[in-house]
Amino acid sequence: MEVFAPVVFEAYRQVEWPAEGSLLLDHLPFRTRAFADGRRIPAGRVAFDVFCAVGYLAGKPRLWRAEAFSSAHPANWSAFLGSLPGEPKRIVCEAHKGMLQAIGARWAQVELHRCEWHLQHALERLLAKEIRNNPSDELQELRARAEGALVGPAFWGQFARVARTARNESLDRWIAVNAPVIEAQFARRGPSWRRPPDMPLTTAALEQITRPIITALYPRRYALRNRQRLNRLLMLLQLHANGHDDVHAYARAIRFQLEANAGRPLERRRAIADPAGSPSLR
């Protein structure tokens, strides 16, 4: 797999970021058990992240790039965004600080659209927490309204007016931070019937496309310690996600390379091995 994955992937490799439509960005954290002071950490720790980008071809979402990193640090996001030339016109993503920092540094002029599902989910989580801590009729009403708060400007305006009467410090702070983003997005997104398929409001298409990656890697997460090897596995998973996994095409590509190189692959497995005791993803 690690020797021939780049060979079969080459014909489908994207050579630049999409210049039209939207680029959806997110990361998939893979957690393992962890302990501190002899006690288990409930959520474990992130062993590695898989950064994913989805672009659009003829109005249909395609997994553009997938790459594993040891963490979601801004420097790793910068490396991911810099792995291809070009600049997208529009990015849809959640509010991950490392990602946003890297986007701002590399593509300062890009139209940045915060995923509206993640915004609404964050709002609903906040309200649920506040209701547990301090139940009130006002917060219960706001929780009921939150489900449709981001449908459009009118719904958001009604929600914001009711929120002001609740006088909840955490909610007021959330609205102060996020209202400018939400209202700016309302101003430029236009009516739904005029919105083309490659201008989504959420990262739902990315989540759907990358679900098989999670399914494939999660049971193996403890064994995945070599970054280069994992990235070559991700090449095959990308081909599968985009419907390009053809065993006959694979065989032709491998045979062509072997025939051109006296029956030997261009690389050896040892070339991507980690130094003993120094895994690249831990």
Q: PLM ranges: what are they?
A:
Residues 29, 121, 207-211:
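Short hydrophobic/aromatic residue motifs in ordered secondary structure
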Residues 89-93, 97-101, 139-282:
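Acidic/histidine-rich catalytic cores and adjacent linkers
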Residues 32-37, 124-126, 233:
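Short, solvent-exposed polar/charged micro-motifs at secondary-structure junctions
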Residues 90-139:
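Conserved beta-strand -> loop -> alpha-helix junction used to position metal-binding or nucleic-acid-contacting
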Residues 34, 102, 126, 215-216:
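Short, function-defining helix-loop hinge/capping sites that tune catalysis or transport
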Residues 2-93, 97, 101, 181, ...:
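RNase H-like nuclease fold core
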Residues 84-85, 107, 217:
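A broad structural signal for alpha-helix termini and local helix breaks/kinks
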